[in-house]
Regions:
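Basic, nucleic-acid-binding surfaces and adjacent catalytic neighborhoods in DNA/RNA-processing proteins
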Residues: 14-33, 38, 43-46, 51, ...
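Acidic/polar residues in short coil/turn loops that connect beta-strands
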Residues: 58, 89-91, 250
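Phosphate/anion-contacting hairpin/loop surfaces
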Residues: 62-162, 166-173
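Glycine-rich, N-terminal phosphate-binding loop and its surrounding beta-alpha-beta segment
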Residues: 47-55, 60, 66-68
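Generic recognition of long tandem-repeat/solenoid scaffolds
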Residues: 52-56, 87-88, 254
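Single conserved hydrophobic/aromatic residue that forms the stacking wall/gate
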Residues: 1-7, 11
Length: 263
């Protein structure tokens, strides 16, 4: 809804971070964003893997990577004291961008020389028909056999946009342990993993995102996450056993040791 309203809106100004964050990345000097963005009309928005791409006039983009929270606020709303970028529109509404752990706020004209962004543009989306069983098989064939299931799915952006957050339910639905090595997978398990990638991400998207995340207006998504920091203390919804939380490959993993045995 906000995106449709903003089609006729023009950026009035942009303001640099009130709270500098060493793990917030920009394209060039963020002090130059004002000259690049001011006066540009908002045209559209699109999602590519882990990126949200805001398209303005004159081929100007604002590409936001995973980890950047974007919130649309109407005219008169209070401006938060801490942010990494703020953009105001000519109707006095504004967009505020914040980063908790890490993220990129990239304002640029024409193209962005970033391998993850370019990969997200060029690789098939798991939500699309181009991401089929044959394509998935090629990804598996190109991966080192000693990679774990988590490393295969959620590192190096083999599958654009698939990160640690959505990984948990994908592996649970496939009944695969996050530490299990790809070399141990049989055909049936690879089929289950492919099916879980497609169906789980489609369900999350159709429901407006996970309930552990918030949308442009601050509302949580409608997809009820099975495995997360909010649910791991609950019993497994399938077998009733205890769930496990572990630190693994730079983030937490959640799994059921009974339903997802380590083979």
């Amino acid at each position: 809804k906000a995106i449709r309203r903003q089609r006729q809106m023009c950026i009035r100004d942009s303001f640099n971070a009130t709270y500098p964050h060493k793990f917030t990345w920009y394209t060039g000097d963020p002090a130059a964003y004002r000259n690049l963005l001011a006066g540009k009309k908002f045209l559209s928005a699109a999602g590519y893997g882990a990126f949200v791409d805001l398209l303005l006039e004159d081929k100007v983009h604002i590409a936001l990577s995973d980890g950047v929270n974007m919130r649309y606020c109407p005219a008169g709303a209070g401006i938060p004291p801490k942010y990494q970028l703020l953009i105001t529109f000519d109707d006095d509404s504004f967009l505020v961008f914040t980063v908790a752990m890490y993220g990129g706020i990239n304002a640029f004209r024409d193209t962005l020389d970033n391998p993850y962004y370019l990969g997200a543009l060029s690789k098939p989306s798991p939500l699309g028909d181009g991401f089929d069983a044959a394509y998935f098989d090629r990804l598996v064939a190109g991966a080192k056999p000693n990679l774990s299931a988590k490393a295969f799915l959620a590192t190096e952006q083999r599958i654009p946009g698939l990160g640690n957050g959505v990984l948990q339910d994908i592996l649970f639905n496939a009944r695969i342990h996050p530490k299990r090595k790809m070399a141990t997978f049989g055909e049936r398990e690879l089929d289950a993993l492919f099916g879980a990638v497609k169906s789980t991400l489609a369900e999350m998207t159709a429901a407006g995102g996970r309930d552990t995340e918030k949308d442009l207006f601050g509302n949580p998504g409608g997809y009820k996450v099975v495995l997360s920091k909010n649910t791991y203390a609950d019993p497994c919804p399938v077998c009733g056993g205890a769930l496990v939380k572990e630190a693994y490959l730079g983030g937490a993993v959640y799994y059921c040791p009974h339903c997802q045995p380590l083979k």
